[in-house]
Amino acid sequence: MHRSDAAPASSIRIYFRLLSYVRPYVGLFAVSILGYVIFASSQPMLAGVLKYFVDGLTHPDAALVTGVPLLDGMELMHGVPLMIVLIAAWQGLGGYLGNYFLARVSLGLVHDLRQTLFDSLLRLPNTYFDQHSSGHLISRITFNVTMVTGAATDAIKIVIREGLTVVFLFAYLLWMNWRLTLVMVAILPLISLMVRNASGKFRKQSRKIQVAMGDVTHVASETIQGYRVVRSFGGEHYERERFRAASEDNTRKQLKMVKTSAVYTPTLQLVTYSAMAVVLFLVLRLRGEASVGDLVAYITAAGLLPKPIRQLSEVSSTIQRGVAGAESIFEQLDDKPEVDHGRIERERVSGRIEVRDLSFRYPGSDREVLDSVSFTVEPGQMIALVGRSGSGKSTLANLIPRFYHHDRGQILIDGVDVEDYTLKNLRRHIALVTQQVTLFNDTVANNIAYGDLAGLPRAAVEAAAEAGYAKEFIDRLPQGFDTLIGENGVTLSGGQRQRLAIARALLKNAPILILDEATSALDTESERHIQAALHRVMQARTTLVIAHRLSTIEQADVIMVMDHGRIVERGSHAELLAAGGHYARLHAMQFREEPAVAEGR
């Protein structure tokens, strides 16, 4: 594989794809280009005015001066300062139009890219989030997009403004003396070779910088989210060292990029100025063939060239940083969204669930998490799944709403394979409450009436809160249902957060309710109230309960005991106790533990 050969073509392809995001702003972009044309045209104007001024001083009777009626040579010469001011104003106008309108393009591009990237996150499958840390995903939206914007707009600004300046100056120099100008043109292949060589290094280093920046964001994100654990277990030193290591790695990679640029830019300047030195030497040989004004104008125009050439050479690093950032962004955008080939949509289902010979393993694993699982849940029934951690209970619950796709077997709702429902319609029929509660930095009411539930009346929200035994503590909050609860409900207790999650599920009023350790964070009194509330709402719903505390599922119609991905027992509470198998042993173990815990209190 010849990566070095493929990389430039790949860079061009990525860059042109990136520029496609500028298309909605083509009008603004055109105005900015016009501004830079105005700006660039002012450069040779200055050299021309100096030629006119010097020739006027040395030869006041020159035809250019005497050919203007009503004014003598010196009167015309007094107009030169005004011409310089007008050229500066012309240049300022061009700079304003170019910079302002390109900034509008740049800010729009940042918004569009971030929005597109965020929208893609909402469509990606669960497995994508399992394989990518939140820190790296956040870094793409923040750091990478900023780098990409630099390539798409800031780099264009330099390429257009300085590129046009070089074109105008070269055109002027060719018009003045094409033979001398060819000496400067001769260095362009060497400059091109240097730029190509540096571009590969810049892009490679930029990829490493973005990964390192993602590591910094990841460590910071984990520490902030788990700050209670960090402080409780004395992890401050460990996290400090972990962050320092990530930050130092990022700094080293940044410095390597700076070092490459620091060597590359002066080398390019040396080549450019060497060409200028040759030109100046040749100018001395032409003293008798050109006027003093011609020589001054030529030297002035040639002297204006190194700055734009240097800036054009430096823009390579900006472009390659952006291309590397765009590469990671497009990798995410090109990742396949959740598979949704279903076509069936139903207003409401009765809630009959049938699982046939279901098997599943996580990507990259050779262990079956679920192995030939089969069962049926009739509408309105309550089914409980119990078993040791890792037996496959939560995995089974995640397969019903298609958070993952099973390898073998079928899951049917009302006789229709879940794969045949559209994802949105399937999930509308399922309310899910897990042990890991997710709340948002918003009001209590907006956390209960979230997403598709946002338009429901306040009375329905309050009724759901009451049914979830949450209204009692909500009424004690400073602004009641309008109280802001902080990031992930940080101002609430674990039990309060879980009750809000249950209220949200109850408000959804879905025919299928999945409770995955939903009452694990509740105290005994709250759990008793919740169980009573759930008992009422379960009568009209098919309910799948995953529980560790067996006392919470004794009233289930069917209890299924799972072990190593298989259902090893099923029956009612009484039947399973009488059988003396897995369930009876789990029950006896908890029966011994609970009195001991109570005595310890």
From Swiss-Prot:
What is this entry's stated membrane topology?
A: Multi-pass membrane protein
What PROSITE patterns does this protein's entry cite?
Answer: ABC_TM1F, ABC_TRANSPORTER_1, ABC_TRANSPORTER_2, MSBA
* EC identifiers of the protein: 7.5.2.6
Q: Where does ATP bind?
A: G387, R388, S389, G390, S391, G392, K393, S394
Q: Where's the ABC transmembrane type-1 domain?
A: 30-321
InterPro entries membership: AAA+_ATPase (IPR003593), ABC1_TM_dom (IPR011527), ABC1_TM_sf (IPR036640), ABC_transporter-like_ATP-bd (IPR003439), ABC_transporter-like_CS (IPR017871), ABC_transpr_lipidA (IPR011917), P-loop_NTPase (IPR027417), Type_1_exporter (IPR039421)
Residue limits of the ABC transporter domain?
353-589
Q: What are the protein's UniProt keywords? A: ATP-binding, Cell inner membrane, Cell membrane, Lipid transport, Membrane, Nucleotide-binding, Translocase, Transmembrane, Transmembrane helix, Transport
Instruction: Please list every transmembrane segment annotated in the UniProt record, as residue ranges.
Output: 26-46, 82-102, 167-187, 263-283
Organism superkingdom: Bacteria
Where along the sequence do coiled-coil regions lie?
none
**Which cellular component appears as one GO term in the record?**
plasma membrane
Which molecular function GO terms apply here? ABC-type oligopeptide transporter activity; ATP binding; ATP hydrolysis activity; ATPase-coupled lipid transmembrane transporter activity
Write down the chemical reaction(s) this protein catalyses. Answer: ATP + H2O + lipid A-core oligosaccharideSide 1 = ADP + phosphate + lipid A-core oligosaccharideSide 2
Query: Localized where?
Result: Cell inner membrane
What task does this protein carry out? Involved in lipopolysaccharide (LPS) biosynthesis. Translocates lipid A-core from the inner to the outer leaflet of the inner membrane. Transmembrane domains (TMD) form a pore in the inner membrane and the ATP-binding domain (NBD) is responsible for energy generation.
**Assembly with partners or alone:** Homodimer.
Q: What protein family does this chain belong to?
A: Belongs to the ABC transporter superfamily. Lipid exporter (TC 3.A.1.106) family.
Q: What PANTHER family has UniProt attached to this entry? A: ATP-BINDING CASSETTE SUB-FAMILY B MEMBER 10, MITOCHONDRIAL, ATP-DEPENDENT PERMEASE MDL1, MITOCHONDRIAL
- Domain characteristics, as noted in the entry: In MsbA the ATP-binding domain (NBD) and the transmembrane domain (TMD) are fused.
Protein name according to UniProt:
ATP-dependent lipid A-core flippase
Q: Which organism does this record belong to?
A: Aromatoleum aromaticum (strain DSM 19018 / LMG 30748 / EbN1) (Azoarcus sp. (strain EbN1))
